[in-house]
Amino acid sequence: MLFASNAIILKIKQRNSNSYIYTLYTYEEGLKEVIIFTNQKILCSNLKLYRIYFVLFKKGAPWDQIQRLYPLFFYPKIEQNPLKMIVLEYLSELIIYQLYSPENCTFIYFIFHYTLFQLNICSNNMILPIFISSLYSLLKFLGWEPELSNCVYTGESLNSENSNLTDSKIGFSASYGGIVKLNVLPKQEYIGFFNKDELFIFTNDN
């Protein structure tokens, strides 16, 4: 299968002057932490796989104990966009610290891969809907769903005729776990905004 040996970078941490620890999400094994040596490009160049494949080693293993070659996805347009990078980092942290079980790793992998693909080609005004859709799917996997019908701060309902939520933009707060009326939280708590029609389309798609 095409995805069977793919890996997605979730996090990179410098180990020493010669190597980095890469936290990856793989199709077959879920989370995988490996050491990548900076001079591995010599080996990869010889294999004509430079910039396409990463050579994975067990921690502390010598050079002759290569585990596997993983095709690794690159998303240059995400790396060039600070807002897209925030989304990538947020979802990565969620996967690393909450979705660590190897069970159903293919399900999580497909959600994350699809999200990265969409972020790489989308315009700025589509970043939030893509993020919310992916977050919604991942949180459902954990058994919790964001609140998308009522303001989690005031309790106002989108379906109420008397609510001004129906006539204005609706904020979304990841830390509060759902939609929030504008101007009731500090500005930094809002990661984006919907109007009612956009939110209706999103909730019906999921």
UniProtKB/Swiss-Prot annotation:
Subcellular location: Plastid, Cyanelle
Keyword match Plastid: yes
Superkingdom field: Eukaryota
Transmembrane residue ranges: none
Keywords: Cyanelle, Plastid
One Pfam short name: RecO_C
Alphabetical list of InterPro entries matching this protein: ARFGAP/RecO (IPR037278), RecO (IPR003717), RecO_C (IPR042242)
Protein's GO biological process: DNA recombination; DNA repair
One GO cellular component term: cyanelle
Protein name stated in the entry: Uncharacterized 24.3 kDa protein in hemA-psbN intergenic region
Native source organism of the sequence: Cyanophora paradoxa
